[in-house]
């Protein structure tokens, strides 16, 4: 039973799945000898098991130490693993255990002090400080070799502690030099041109067959396949059909004996391929035929976006059967979905030269994708066609996104039975009607231009959100308004996954205005780690492209913190991640505007953790300037709480240039006891 339970714990799994085996070991009440036989197993569990299981293993190893059955080398091995974990409770307990061991046998310091130094790299500066105090308390004047090893590990300390360690251990490589600080930001997203020229029939068939078997096609792949199918159909539909038939032979609709396929069951390139092979009835593709949506309710923007992409694919498939197009107008210039205005003007010119009538949905999609450049409007107007006139109007003020309104509400979306949910107070954005879309676009596009509120009911199948970004790749603000309810659900509820959409949205074009900044602020407080990481990616992308308004983002975070939409501890985790990439100055510039919200009306829970991240940023980048509102009273509080300690640390960092500031609160001397 003992061996089986321990082996099951070593295999890992969710905490709930492991609880039975830890409880069984408690019931079995192992003797000291039985525990000692599995020392290596306890160390492995303390290193890698889920936090509750690791805590049990740590307690078992502590009991072995108290019984004199845990040698110094085993304790060092255990400590190096545990001190690497992020859980502060486990790290704090391990440092206490190391302190006991060092007081029991000072001769083991050459083994235990290097293990203690593993905590120098922990994100929590208080734990770094505790480890440094422990080293200072037990390091002897003659320990030159040990001091050299510890100095190497001290490079991982925060700037203020690194200066203290330098006085204790001697020279430390790469000391912090605020005068030489350089912000590290990611490179701006690279754009790849989307080209379809020169692709053979065989390459087209191979691409279409691959996309028919996946639900994770990129915008680049889908748009390339659509345009290739249209181009080759116009040149030689018979030859294209001959290439497609063997590649798609395993598709049920491709068999000759199945009759016409149902277009509701096909999408994108596969729908066009079915048209090329003659498996679709033109009557089923008529514009007036209803499209089965993937959402529910008139307020579901995801359903509206899906209907737009479906309508364009059906339109192209119908033209394959009736009046083939030479190429598509809306094929993007870049992999992100953006269409350059000059490319669209060139395509419209070619259409006019060949007497080709543009497909309405394809042209409307092209307008939504085109980069807004007023200088190209004159060229568009010179085409002297209806499409040229509409393009010229779209490139100027008529096509500009409608400004949104902002307010705070506690009313949730209407339920399907007509009621309305009560929800925590939160910020909502509302869009007015976009008159140009309502007047000049086909009916299927009209929902994109209707007034939209975040309190409308929205239910839809997931999985197409990333593809929908390419419908409006030059309007991040409108898409951010649509995305905000999902991000708010990630912050105040159990929702997850919207952060990935946000990180991709930040890479698109168009203004990065208040809506996008509010979306990033909301996602920084998401419940789930992956959504917060995606929000950090979005923040860094905006910073790298010079579009991040740190003051605006800080004010949004302050409001969200006061409303309770964003929790301080979650924001601290996200900010710590952003700073760890090297963006200390950017992160501090954002936090400077957010901190008053957790300090002015009485310190909020988690404020100390947020202050610690802010202090880290200031110490690394050497920022100065006025103290955030509420910091001085927090720093004046008595006691050693994390809030007071970190407030004093931040105040000191802001008031004193890091190159000359002294760590007044922490003064260490060799052999000092009581740490």
Q: Which sequence ranges carry the predicted segments?
A:
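Alpha-helical structural signal with a strong bias for long, charge-/Ser/Thr/Gly-rich
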Residues: 1-78, 82, 90-92, 96-114, ...
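Catalytic cores of large soluble enzymes that bind and process phosphate-bearing ligands
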Residues: 123
